[in-house]
């Protein structure tokens, strides 16, 4: 049996612990109980078969292929189940011996292995056992013979093997990723009914009692208990089946191993009921208002606005197939979102620090997360971006703009704190008392002398107090000893000893030590300190995690924020007009202040895992593969703007990646990315500490080699404004000439001394495997699906119904460019009713129009949209041609 999977063996992590529901484990126990019959069989012809079963079921023994083959030669019928009611293939799957399946399939006797064989104990086929127990490796072996398997075979309860795949499980994701669900066809389950309880009025007297009973059953089901044999009835069925059975007044019996989630699964391949929202072009203004109100109505639920946009898009794209309506809806939605978060919406391009405004980072991170989910939903919608390539570019621009808005809000909060918390904040006394040549030394020396004299007097007074206390303690000790000898009271001796200890201990403490032992006062805590910088970066990290923003977008937000902060700090040090920062003493203090930020970065370090299920060839062409076929992509002529792509590097090269246009830059650990951005500042501070000690060109060259991120222009600029200490040597004039010659040789300009501030890198989009791993796996995967609560659905339906009735009451206005009537006319409503609200539509199939009045493949109804010009307004910079390079 040749493998169609090559070497794609998966580690089955579910083997080490129980899998499936409690009922699946009960069925597993029934099969294991049949092993007791093996020792009771006395038929010689069954000896080889029995030994083979014992080999399979012995969990303490490793797989012995040679022994298995020898015993298998003596077995005439590999499908025999007369001994225990269970065949060899069932035992192999139950005990997870996947490697034996191929040997059993290619048995020496030549008998054909029946892969649809049902056991007599539970009534499961091999595929049903593999799915219910989540034996992924067994599934691999079975699918190698997919042409021999009846995938639509049902058990006694009327369920197929597909119905036993637990949703959101690793097995479900594996089958979906490898396109194994293509063998699945829709089968109507004929589920047997049982008679209704006699006293139904007690059970279903009102809606509240039914709801309470349902939740009680769910709680008991989780605990492995039931109220009655019918307690599991229709609790995990689809909503449509559940409502149908409930309306019939009878409970249904389903397979207890069928553990579908109570809420169901969003079907991206079919247009199912309640998974799209009907609307018209005249509903768009009110839908946009509803969209913008969701942060207040549903705070931190970022899947709701994404689901609202996506379900409307599904209706326009798959139901009525109108490309203009899809693109207009997305354009207006993104414009409305961008306008609501833009702190500089009408201010134009950001060119100066004064133009920066502190926006609401909670709202901005909310919409960033919303758009990341919308991007994920559209990627799951097959070939959506190939049908609408302009949508991807617009989505890239909007996500990019919101990231810059969020970074701008953080940066403007940092700008006002850099001077007070980093440049002027000092904790080292020597830095405060340092004398500089440019100061009025006459007055400063007098002040310094007074401070030294005061400090000397304080120390002398402290010594005198210690001597007096010591003298008093000695006298008190002698006095206590005399009283103790006279009275003979041991307790007085202990008391005097305690007093002596207390007095002696007090000698070793002074006010200065006690001041450091106690926490700072509230006044001290309110003063600016480097902790303020840490708090702002911590707030950014918090809101990104709060809204479950994709890690690659989190990394980009933090990276740009640290980069803007580092470049601004670097330029502030070089531009210091008061010459406070350009000195070796202040350089030490600033470096010490930055260590607080370094500690926070180390404590909050994280690394975005690289996508595993994508090769370098496809990754280099991503995200262009979303809108074009691989053969049509030319890497030298990118068709998407403002987006970074993957550039492979040598695996043996462990150097840091400095190129932000390479998407690998953001797959480095956060502390390494921060190190790259902060390196120029750190190296400048190191230069300031050693510059005046250099006395030769050799020492200067070796120092420059150790500081590669600092250019000769910057080195010379720092020395021109350097603040020399009183006894510090001046920077060697020969070294200045050397730097000047270096600048002339390299044709550098002195204007290049400062780093570029507010640099905007390209956007990096997460790949589809990354998003699938993050959003489609795990117990919380249901919360990432584009479902909407009933309140939002009702709001959209009400908007559409009210507008529809208003349009019906208005006189019909014929269109000048088209002889067709308005989409919201009577023909539309009749057409919609004939289609059937409760039917599912396969979006991969071509839907033929049923009448000329409503052509689903035609755009006549949406060639002229009532676009709400006053509802959404883009910022002023969006009309600028240079927006792609620098929207700020």
Curated annotation (Swiss-Prot):
Keyword Ion transport: no
Subcellular locations according to the entry: Golgi apparatus
Polar residues bias (residue ranges): 809-823, 867-880
Residue ranges constituting the Dilute domain according to the UniProt record: 360-745
SUPFAM superfamilies: Ankyrin repeat (SSF48403)
GO molecular function annotation: GTPase binding
Record key words, sorted: Golgi apparatus
Record carries keyword Kinase: no
CDD domains: Myo5p-like_CBD_DIL_ANK (cd15473)
Gene Ontology CC: Golgi apparatus
Stored Pfam families: DIL (PF01843)
Source superkingdom: Eukaryota
Primary localization class, coarse: Golgi
Stretches the record annotates as Disordered: 462-504, 805-827, 865-888
Cysteine disulfide links: none
Other facts noted in the record for this chain: Present with 3690 molecules/cell in log phase SD medium.
Protein name: Dilute domain-containing protein YPR089W
């Amino acid at each position: 049996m040749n493998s169609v999977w090559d070497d794609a063996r998966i580690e089955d992590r579910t083997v080490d612990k129980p899998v499936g529901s409690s009922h699946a484990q009960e069925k597993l126990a029934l099969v294991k109980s049949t092993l007791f019959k093996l020792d009771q069989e006395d038929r010689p012809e069954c000896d080889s078969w029995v030994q083979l079963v014992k080999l399979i079921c012995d969990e303490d023994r490793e797989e012995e292929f040679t022994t298995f083959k020898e015993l298998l030669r003596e077995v005439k019928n590999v499908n025999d189940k007369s001994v225990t009611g269970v065949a060899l293939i069932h035992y192999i799957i139950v005990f997870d011996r996947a490697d034996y399946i191929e040997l059993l399939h290619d048995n020496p006797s030549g008998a054909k292995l029946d892969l649809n064989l049902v056991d007599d104990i539970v009534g499961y086929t091999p595929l049903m056992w593999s799915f219910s127990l989540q034996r992924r490796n067994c599934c691999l072996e079975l699918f190698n013979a997919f042409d021999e398997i009846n995938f639509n075979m049902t058990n006694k309860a009327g369920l197929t093997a597909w119905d036993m795949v637990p949703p959101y499980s690793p097995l479900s994701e594996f089958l979906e990723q490898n396109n194994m669900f293509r063998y699945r066809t829709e089968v109507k389950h004929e589920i047997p009914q049982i008679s209704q309880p006699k006293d139904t009025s007690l059970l279903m007297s009102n809606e509240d009692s039914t709801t309470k009973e349902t939740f009680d059953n769910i709680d008991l089901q989780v605990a492995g208990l039931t109220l009655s044999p019918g307690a599991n009835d229709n609790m995990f069925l689809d909503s449509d089946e559940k409502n149908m059975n409930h309306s019939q007044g009878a409970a249904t019996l389903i397979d207890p191993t069928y553990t579908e989630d109570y809420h169901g699964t969003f079907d991206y391949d079919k247009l199912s009921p309640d998974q799209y929202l009907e609307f018209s072009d005249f509903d768009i203004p009110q839908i946009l208002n509803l969209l913008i109100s969701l942060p207040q109505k549903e705070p931190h639920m970022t899947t709701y606005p994404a689901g609202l946009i996506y379900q409307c898009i599904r209706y326009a794209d798959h139901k009525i197939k109108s490309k203009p309506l899809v693109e207009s809806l997305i354009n207006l939605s993104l414009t409305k979102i961008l306008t609501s978060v833009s702190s500089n919406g009408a201010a134009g391009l950001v060119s100066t620090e004064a133009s920066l405004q502190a926006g609401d980072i909670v709202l901005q991170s909310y919409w960033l997360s919303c758009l990341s989910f919308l991007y994920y939903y559209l990627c799951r919608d097959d070939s959506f971006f190939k049908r609408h390539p302009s949508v991807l570019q617009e989505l890239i621009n909007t996500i990019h703009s919101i990231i810059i808005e969020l970074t701008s809000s953080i940066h403007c909060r940092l700008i006002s704190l850099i001077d007070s918390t980093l440049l002027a904040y000092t904790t080292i006394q020597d830095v405060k008392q340092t004398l500089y040549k440019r100061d009025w030394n006459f007055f400063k020396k007098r002040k310094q002398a007074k401070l030294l004299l005061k400090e000397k007097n304080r120390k002398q007074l402290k010594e005198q107090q210690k001597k007096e206390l010591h003298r008093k303690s000695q006298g008190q000790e002698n006095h206590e000893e005399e009283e103790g000898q006279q009275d003979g009271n041991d307790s007085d001796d202990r008391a005097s000893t305690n007093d002596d200890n207390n007095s002696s201990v007090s000698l070793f403490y002074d006010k200065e030590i006690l001041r450091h032992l106690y926490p700072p006062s509230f006044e001290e805590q309110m003063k600016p300190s480097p902790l303020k910088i840490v708090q702002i970066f911590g707030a950014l990290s918090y809101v990104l995690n709060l809204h479950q923003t994709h890690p690659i977008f989190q990394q980009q937000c933090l990276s740009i924020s640290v980069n803007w902060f580092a470049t601004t700090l670097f330029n502030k040090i070089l531009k210091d007009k008061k010459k406070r920062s350009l000195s070796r003493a202040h350089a030490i203090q600033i470096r010490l202040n930055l260590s607080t930020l370094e500690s926070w970065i180390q404590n909050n370090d994280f690394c975005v895992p690289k996508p595993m299920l994508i090769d370098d060839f496809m990754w280099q062409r991503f995200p262009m593969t979303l809108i074009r076929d691989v053969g049509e992509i030319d890497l030298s002529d990118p068709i998407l703007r403002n987006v970074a792509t993957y550039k492979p590097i040598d695996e043996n090269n462990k150097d840091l990646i400095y190129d932000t246009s390479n998407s690998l830059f953001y797959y480095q650990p956060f502390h390494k990315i921060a190190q790259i951005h902060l390196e120029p500042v750190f190296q400048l501070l190191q230069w300031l500490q050693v510059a005046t000690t250099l006395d030769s060109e050799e020492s200067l060259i070796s120092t420059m080699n150790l500081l590669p991120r600092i250019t000769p222009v910057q080195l010379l600029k720092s020395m021109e404004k350097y603040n020399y200490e009183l006894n510090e040597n001046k920077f060697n004039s020969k070294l200045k000439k050397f730097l000047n010659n270096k600048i002339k040789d390299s044709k550098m300009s002195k204007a290049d001394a400062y780093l570029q501030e507010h640099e905007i890198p390209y956007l990096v989009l997460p790949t589809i495997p990354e998003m699938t791993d993050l959003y489609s796996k795990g117990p919380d995967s249901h919360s990432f699906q584009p479902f909407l609560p009933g309140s939002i659905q009702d709001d959209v339906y009400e908007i559409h119904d009210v507008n529809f009735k208003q349009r019906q009451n208005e006189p019909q206005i014929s269109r000048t460019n088209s002889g067709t009537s308005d989409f919201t006319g009577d023909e539309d409503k009749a057409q919609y009713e004939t289609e059937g609200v409760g039917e599912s539509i396969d979006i991969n199939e071509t839907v033929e129009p049923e009448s000329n009045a409503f052509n689903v493949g035609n755009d006549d109804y949406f060639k002229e949209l009532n676009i709400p010009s006053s509802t959404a307004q883009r910022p002023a910079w969006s009309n600028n041609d240079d927006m792609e390079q620098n929207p700020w």
